[in-house]
């Protein structure tokens, strides 16, 4: 075991544990944007920087292992100042129209900026424009280049988990951004629309195409007969989302609330999150 001190608290963790993981075992949260354990540990965002006694430079917590006797400060004036500057620089290259963003209230960048008390950005705003910001509006997956913070999560999750290699870096220097790999447009790629990149994007740079208005138009059309179609994953998770105990969150109760339900068990359309087969089978058994 390696013994160290974090914010005055003695911590003992196995050899090879990162500072971020060691802090978590002690109940100390270190802000981060790009980190995904075992998938994206490249410290691209620099938000997890901490102060380590004896080190001249700030140290990224997500990819630096602990050492015996290390003394770490995660919330010292120097650590907070460094973190604040790094977040301000990220915000200077991010479209900060939070009120109209689909991730408002559920955005890691927004949360960290609020925690740091950032109310304005002292740097010139630099957002991609023209061809660098272009995207088709008809594809089910939508990307907003002006919100991308270049954390690389989408690249790594698509490469290492889905093995589809849809995303890659494009451009050089200050013009570096994320785009579809091999100079393709998204509709010509092998994108499976699994939704993993959307799920792991810490901001609103990736989202599903919004067809809400089309649904309302269909509901209002007297020439159309509409029914509700529910995927198995929704049947299993709706109660949790509403804070209902499992014995109350039954399929029958949901069907009664929706008045008309066409159960698509066994042939649901693909959804953006993976379904647990055991849960689906349990639901089928209830029937």
Model-assigned labels for residue ranges:
Residues 1, 133-135, 175-177, 232-237:
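A short alpha-helix capping/helix-coil boundary motif
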Residues 2, 10, 15-75, 79, ...:
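Iron-sulfur-associated redox domains of electron-transfer enzymes in respiratory
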Residues 7:
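ABC transporter nucleotide-binding domain catalytic core, centered on the Walker B motif
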Residues 20, 110, 155, 198, ...:
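Short glycine-/small-residue-rich flexible loop motifs, especially phosphate/cofactor-binding loops
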Residues 25, 115, 160, 203, ...:
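Residues at alpha-helix termini
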Residues 46-193, 199, 206-218, 224-225:
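Fe-S ferredoxin-like electron-transfer domains
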Residues 201-202, 240:
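Short, basic, glycine/proline-bearing loop/turn elements
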């Amino acid at each position: 075991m390696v013994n160290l001190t974090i914010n005055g608290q003695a911590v003992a963790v196995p050899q090879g544990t990162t500072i971020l993981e060691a802090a978590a075992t002690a109940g100390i949260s270190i802000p981060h944007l790009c980190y995904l354990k075992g998938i994206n540990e490249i410290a691209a965002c620099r938000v997890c920087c901490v102060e380590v006694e004896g080190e001249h430079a700030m140290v990224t917590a997500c990819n630096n292992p602990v050492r015996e006797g290390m003394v770490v400060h995660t919330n010292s004036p120097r650590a907070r100042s460094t973190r604040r500057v790094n977040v301000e620089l990220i915000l200077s290259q991010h479209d900060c129209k939070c009120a109209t963003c689909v991730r408002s209230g559920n955005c890691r960048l927004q949360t960290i900026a609020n925690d740091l008390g950032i109310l304005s950005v002292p740097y010139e705003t630099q957002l991609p424009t023209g061809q660098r910001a272009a995207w088709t509006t008809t594809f089910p997956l939508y990307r907003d280049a002006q919100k991308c913070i270049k954390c690389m999560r989408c690249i790594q999750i698509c490469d290492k988990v889905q093995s589809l290699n849809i995303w890659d870096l494009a451009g050089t220097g200050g013009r570096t951004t994320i785009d579809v790999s091999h100079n393709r447009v998204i509709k010509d790629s092998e994108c499976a629309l699994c939704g993993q990149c959307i799920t792991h994007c810490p901001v609103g740079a990736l989202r599903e195409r919004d067809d809400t208005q089309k649904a309302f138009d269909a509901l209002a059309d007297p020439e159309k007969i509409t029914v509700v179609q529910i995927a198995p994953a929704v049947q299993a998770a709706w109660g949790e989302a509403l804070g209902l105990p499992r014995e109350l969150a039954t399929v029958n109760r949901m069907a009664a609330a929706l008045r008309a339900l066409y159960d698509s068990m066994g042939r649901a359309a693909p959804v953006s999150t993976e379904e647990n087969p055991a849960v689906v089978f349990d639901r089928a058994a209830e029937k």
